[in-house]
Amino acid sequence: QPSTRDAILWGADYAPLTYLAEPMRLFSSMFFHFGLIHLMLNMWALYIFGSVAEQLFGRMYFIGLYVCAGLMGSLLSGYMNIQDSYNLIEGGVANPDLLPAVSAGASGAVMGLGASLTVLALLPMLPQQRFILDKKTLVMVMGLNLALGFMISGINNAAHIGGMLMGAFLTLLWYISQKMQRSHLFNLIALLVGFALCVLLYQHNLTLIEPIRPLWQEILEMMQQQLKL
């Protein structure tokens, strides 16, 4: 089980560090996991969803969707950390639950794949579609994962929701491109739009950070001293 110090050194997302100094953590945190069980659960889900999604979307769109979903998960997680810091200042009482937390894992990207398959299952089947997707099973699995995120502490549900929203959005664009039979160019444009949305949310988060920058700098300095970073 990696320590908090190890997680920070290996690229985990910690909002004050990510937004004040190292934005690459939005990406690198997708590949770090908190122990073997965390890694195995996400890789099992990636195998289940990914093996179908790659064959449906093609390799390029599959990879693009996966990365955009993971980034959106990290960004929405950061947005929630920002809102918690606003609440911490407004409350005037030190509440540990509102402090930024270290987060990592591929679950946002994986949930994006799950959402993409769920959306496809709910839409009329395309003539060229190679798989019949079980909508009841997919809705149940995705709903259960979301519910567990709200019921169990320590799960970054904001990352899950961000990944799901991006996965659903890019799947709708892919579906439209298949109906129009202009898949290659339209798919590239769709991925660029997805990435642009990530950039916009990142810029929005940077704007929101300005009023809480002194607080985050203080929190970051305290963590660096405690962990001897």
Where are these regions (language model features)?
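Membrane-interface micro-motifs in multi-pass membrane enzymes
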Residues: L99-L120, A159
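Hydrophobic transmembrane alpha-helices
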Residues: G50, S116-L123, M166-Y175
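Active-site His/Glu-centered metal-binding helix of metallohydrolases
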Residues: M40, W44, L75, V110, ...
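Hydrophobic alpha-helical transmembrane segments
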Residues: I63-V67, V110, L138-G143, I161, ...
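Alpha-helical transmembrane bundle and helix-membrane interface signal
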Residues: Q55, L120-K135, Y175-L188
